[in-house]
Amino acid sequence: MNVFRTLTSLVVVFAAMSLTAFAAPKSIKVATDATWPPMEMLDAKKQIVGYDIDFLNAVAKETGLAVEFKNTAWDGIFAGLDTGKYDAVISSVTITDERKAKYDFTDAYTSIGQILVVPKTDKTSKTIADLKGKKVGSQIGTTGAMEVKKVAGVESKTYDEIGLAFEDMATGRISGVVCDEPVAAHFALKKKEYKEKFKIVGKAFTKEGYGIVVKKGNKELVDQLNKGIKAVKAKKLDTRIHTKWVK
C-alpha cells in the first residue's frame, strides 16, 4: 500500500511539473534594442517607447500578459534569449529562414522594406549599386547590412547603432545608409539636424515581415502571442499604433 501511494504521489508530482513547464506564462521579460526609432527608442525620460513597445503592450493586454522590457544592445540580444535571460525579443526583427532555423517566431505583425538614404548633395544615386567604390553604412547583423554586402564594388561599413551611421554620413565618412523604411524616414525626414542634409532615394527594395522571437520549442508562448496579435489586428489597434509612430 505504501509503495502504491508513493508511486501515485510521484505521478501527480511529475504531472504537475509537466503542466508547469508547458503552461502559457503570465509575465515575460522582453529584450529590445532601443536605438531604432521610431520602432524602439528612449524618450526624454529614458523610458523605452516606440511602435514595437505599444504593439506588444496591446498584445499583452489582449492576452493577460505582464511585460517587462529590457533595453539590450543588438549584438547581444539573441544571446540573452539563448541563455534564458529573456523570454522574447521584439526589436524590428525580420523573419528570415536563417533565423527561423534557430528561433521560433510569431506571425508577422507588420511589414517593411529596406531603403537607401544619401546626402542631398548626391544628385545621381538611386540604388546601392550606384555607390560602387564608396562606403555604405548599416547596423551590424541587420537585413540592411546583408543587402549592402550583396552588392559588388560597394564597401560595407557596419555600426553598433544606426544613429552612428547617420553621424558618419553627416561628416562625409560614408556615402549612404541602408535601413528599414520607418527608421530612414525618422532620420532623413523628421530629425532636425538631418532633414536638410539627407534624402531617401528610390523605393524599398525588399519586403520583410517583423516577428516576435522566442526560444526554439516554446510553442505555448508563440501561440499566446499570436492570439494577441490577431486580436490587436482585428480591433485595428495596429493601425492606430502605426499612425502614432510612423505616419
Task: Please place each PLM-identified region on the residue numbering.
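Extended ligand-binding regions for polar small-molecule ligands
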Residues: 53-62, 122, 129, 134-135, ...
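A ligand-binding cleft/hinge motif common to bilobed small-molecule-binding domains
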Residues: 79, 91-101, 147-150, 175-206
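Short helix-initiation/N-cap motifs at beta->coil->alpha
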Residues: 53, 68-79, 123, 140-143, ...
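A conserved helix-loop-strand patch within extracytoplasmic ligand-binding domains
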Residues: 65, 69, 93-95, 105-156
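Ligand-binding clefts/hinges and TM-proximal coupling segments of bilobed small-molecule sensing domains
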Residues: 66, 143-159, 196-201, 227-247
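Alpha-to-beta junction loops
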Residues: 64-66, 83-91, 134-135, 171-183
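Extracytoplasmic small-molecule ligand-binding "clamshell" domains
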Residues: 24-92
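Periplasmic-binding protein-like
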Residues: 34, 110-118, 181, 185, ...
